[in-house]
From Swiss-Prot:
Cellular-component GO terms for this entry: cytosolic large ribosomal subunit
Pfam family, one: Ribosomal_L35p
Family annotation (HAMAP family): Ribosomal_bL35
SUPFAM superfamilies: L35p-like
PANTHER family in the record: 54S RIBOSOMAL PROTEIN BL35M, LARGE RIBOSOMAL SUBUNIT PROTEIN BL35M
UniProt-recorded name of the protein: Large ribosomal subunit protein bL35
Domain of life from the UniProt record: Bacteria
Keywords from the UniProt entry: Ribonucleoprotein, Ribosomal protein
Cell membrane in keyword set: no
NCBIfam families per record: rpmI_bact (TIGR00001)
Family: Belongs to the bacterial ribosomal protein bL35 family.
One annotated GO molecular function: structural constituent of ribosome
Amino acid sequence: MPKMKTHTGTGKRFRVTGTGKIMRRRANRAHLLEHKTSRRTRRLYDEVPLSSADNRRIKRLLAR
């Protein structure tokens, strides 16, 4: 059976850690930042782990 290909859009949006957790970026930090507080934008910097509900689907798209 041939290898599964990674879904390229998913590959660009998610990162797999060494322990196998899937990390994602937070929304609301791309544009229209003028009216958002510094505190709010600062809290959106970090990547967060993907929710367990989405894990299986994203793993399949990442061919893992």
